[in-house]
């Protein structure tokens, strides 16, 4: 029996073709797939992750509060900027991860070079103030210098009572040793220490050195310099000295330098020179007309180099221009302005000492090979303040390849020939 297709059960009223999409039907509405029910409570994994993040954030905040004002202001400024632009979560991540893993180790390396780690009972208050030198004003540094000089004077006064029958030389030696130990405890080198203690103890020289260590003005100069180096080194560690922020030196150092130059100009303007006949001339005019003027000093240097080159060419020498720089570990910042992970905490002064040491070895090698070179050398900073040297050396034409080979051997690929 032939049954029309329209009368087949399940096909009534349907004209199925290959192009008709399949329609899913469910016996009951609750059989249809729905959205999964999510628990309103966090999972154990989320709770543990949140606890770890909160603990890391609290640890970072606690460590940040122990840092100097320079570090706190820099990190807080970055955190506030991230919170404003990308939200609280991104700002907390920067504080808990970037600060702890990248910034804080660099800051600790720098601080260990300048602060006093082990304190004694009699100088604990002075040393505590000393460890806050980067945050101290000029007046606070001068007050600390007075207190240290007073402490040294009081310490030395007890030596005379302890050695009533000793000779003058022995007493002077004991006074110098005690003062030198206190000076070294405050991260300063005692005057003429190597010469007096390891070569010959000269009484007049020791008395002069002892007088300096008891002077508050001497201590003020030393502490101001120590504080300035400490602050600038912290700025370098915080990546404040680079092409993206401030080239060659930090903004604070540049402001201080300009202020010092301004005070010097004001002092020179207020002074006059007078000869025996009563003729007077402004001291500032003589200053700007001498080599103290940077423009005149630079012009004189260029003229001297050109004249030096002309004389050497007439004598048959040839000139070679060399540029030597330090390895990557001496650079706090990469060429693109990012933090250098290979940096070992070296300061620009450390880099300069490294270049001097290597150049001393090169000179010794040249001397052993009977190669006589002479010329002019200048130091120039990279964008992160790390110095490199430019040297214009003159030598005999037949000695050029030997000199180049020696520089290659000692400098490796850390040098260039122009």
Where are these regions (language model features)?
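Positively charged, glycine-rich low-complexity segments
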Residues: 1-386, 394-418
